[in-house]
């Protein structure tokens, strides 16, 4: 009501150059997002997982995103349609929030489809146990669909990248590596549906299957931790620290350099439609 009351006091500006510039920048940004997501990675680019979700996002979805790289991809890539609700980990720092957030959303709105976006670190912290709660209650829901996307990159990836960019330190494997775990098979074992994807050409079809499922789904995306979570433009200081980390002998140096070059090229090289 307050905004509507202000409308009569607004003056139309004939000079639309600033608006056109913003619109052009937004179009360029979404082109860049898609091009980066379509770049290959070993075994799978996490950006592709979120891009394919964004294309299929139902209006009844409730998205929850955990602390970590899932919050980065959620914030950059997913286009929120009218009606879609979303929630991030409080303060963007509390690991393990996305799974219980999604479960709570399902109890509050049983006819909607919560989609939890979490990493393997948070899933191992408390998410696996929370799935037992889902297994107990899902048959009581009017719509049984709830999806738990797990980025399985075997790494506490957000902190790994923060160490490289903010401190110039290489990845410390003893603190950053986490055990590989069969999330999809675990889901199957407790009566849920498990879907595991490690090839880009299978991602879209896997989302279609998850969104049409007749029970809760654990969507395990076996992704690369080498894809940089950096924005398209970084400061000189960040670039210096990144280079320093690699010079000190990062164990994932080859993959990190390869993916960083691909991401930068997507922002520098001409677009396919230009």
Where are the model-predicted features located?
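Glycine-rich, acidic loop regions that bind phosphate or pyrophosphate groups
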Residues: 1-22, 137, 141, 163, ...
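Hydrophobic, well-ordered secondary-structure elements that form the walls
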Residues: 53, 65, 104, 120, ...
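Glycine-rich beta-alpha junction loops
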Residues: 67-69, 152-155, 222-227
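Thiamine diphosphate
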Residues: 72-156
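Short glycine/proline- and charge-enriched loop/turn segments
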Residues: 80-85, 162-171, 238-240
């Amino acid at each position: 009501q307050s905004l509507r009351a202000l409308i009569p006091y607004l003056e139309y500006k004939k000079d639309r150059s600033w608006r056109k510039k913003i619109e052009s920048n937004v179009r360029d940004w979404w082109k860049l997002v898609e091009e980066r997501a379509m770049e290959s990675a070993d075994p799978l680019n996490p950006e592709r997982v979120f891009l394919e979700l964004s294309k299929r996002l139902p209006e009844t979805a409730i998205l929850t995103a955990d602390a970590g790289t899932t919050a980065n991809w959620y914030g950059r890539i997913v286009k929120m349609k009218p009606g879609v609700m979303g929630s991030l980990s409080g303060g963007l720092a509390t690991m393990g929030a996305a799974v219980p957030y999604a479960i709570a959303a399902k109890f509050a709105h049983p006819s909607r489809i919560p989609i939890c976006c979490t990493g393997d670190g948070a899933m191992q912290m408390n998410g696996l146990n929370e799935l037992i709660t889902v297994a107990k209650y899902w048959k009581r829901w009017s719509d049984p669909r709830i999806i738990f996307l797990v980025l399985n990159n075997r790494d506490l990836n957000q902190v790994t990248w923060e160490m490289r960019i903010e401190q110039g330190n290489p990845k410390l494997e003893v603190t950053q590596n986490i055990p590989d775990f069969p999330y999809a098979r675990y889901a199957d074992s407790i009566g849920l549906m498990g879907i595991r994807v490690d090839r880009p050409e299978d991602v879209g079809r896997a989302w279609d299957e998850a969104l049409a499922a007749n029970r809760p789904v654990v969507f395990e995306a076996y992704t690369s931790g080498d894809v940089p979570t950096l924005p398209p433009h970084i400061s000189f200081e960040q670039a210096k620290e990144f280079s320093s980390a690699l010079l000190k002998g990062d164990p994932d140096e080859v993959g990190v350099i390869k993916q960083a070059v691909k991401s930068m090229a997507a922002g520098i090289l001409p677009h396919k439609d230009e």
